Curated annotation (Swiss-Prot):
Function, in words: An accessory protein needed during the final step in the assembly of 30S ribosomal subunit, possibly for assembly of the head region. Essential for efficient processing of 16S rRNA. May be needed both before and after RbfA during the maturation of 16S rRNA. It has affinity for free ribosomal 30S subunits but not for 70S ribosomes.
Residue stretches making up the PRC barrel domain: 96-175
GO molecular function: ribosome binding
Main location: cytoplasm
Localisation per UniProt entry: Cytoplasm
Domain notes for this protein: The PRC barrel domain binds ribosomal protein uS19.
The name this protein goes by in its record: Ribosome maturation factor RimM
Subunit text: Binds ribosomal protein uS19.
Length: 175
C-alpha cells in the first residue's frame, strides 16, 4: 500500500491487561468514529501493514482495542505507539468549500497582496471555527515564526487550490 494513500486516524497506546488489549488514541472528531473507517493499517518499521480489529470497548473513559491475532501482552507491547491509518479512498467526497485537514496540511499560504505567509503545519479546532497553523519561513519579513489564521471560507480563506497546494487568504502578514 502506498504511504501517500494512507491517512493517520489514530495511534495505539500502552497495553491493557494480559490478553493483548491496547489503549487507543483516536484523532477523529468523535473518538469512536475511528471504528467506522476500516480496514486499518499499522505503520510498522516505516511500512503500512493491514490489521483486523477484533473488538473494542470503553474502559474508564478510554478506548481499548483487541486486534486479531494479538493475544498476549508481550506481543501487544510491540505495537505500543504505532500509528493507525486508513486508505484515503474510504473518506466520502465533500461539498464545495469543505476540506479534509490532511488536504490542507502542507499547503503554501499566500495573502491577497502576494506575500508568502508560510506553510500549513497543522490544524486546530477552536469550537467556533478551525484554525490554520501556518509555519512562517525563517526569512519572514515580519519576524513571525507561526501564524494562526481562522479557516473561514470566503471571509478569510478566499481560495484553496489543492492541485497547486496553495491557499489564498485575506489576512495581514503582520498578524
Amino acid at each position: 500500500m502506498e504511504q501517500q494513500r494512507i491517512e493517520v486516524v489514530g495511534k495505539l497506546g500502552s497495553t491493557y491487561g494480559i490478553r493483548g488489549w491496547l489503549r487507543l488514541y483516536s484523532s477523529t472528531e468523535q473518538a469512536e468514529s475511528i471504528f467506522d473507517y476500516q480496514p486499518w493499517f499499522l505503520k510498522i518499521k516505516g511500512q503500512w501493514q493491514p490489521i483486523e480489529l477484533e473488538s473494542w470497548k470503553f474502559h474508564n473513559h478510554e478506548l481499548i482495542v483487541k486486534l486479531k491475532g494479538i493475544n498476549e501482552r508481550e506481543v501487544a507491547q510491540t505495537l505500543a505507539n504505532v500509528e493507525i491509518g486508513v486508505n484515503l479512498s474510504i473518506f466520502p467526497l465533500l461539498d464545495e468549500g469543505d476540506f479534509y485537514w490532511h488536504d490542507l496540511i502542507g499547503c503554501q499560504v499566500v495573502n491577497l497582496q502576494g506575500y508568502a505567509m508560510g506553510v500549513v503545519s497543522e490544524m486546530m479546532e477552536t469550537g467556533a471555527n478551525d484554525v490554520l497553523v501556518v509555519r512562517a519561513s525563517t526569512k519572514d519579513a515580519f519576524g513571525k515564526k507561526e501564524r494562526l489564521i481562522p479557516f473561514l471560507y470566503e471571509q478569510v480563506v478566499k481560495r484553496v487550490d489543492l492541485s497547486s497546494k496553495t491557499i489564498e487568504v485575506d489576512w495581514d502578514a503582520g498578524f
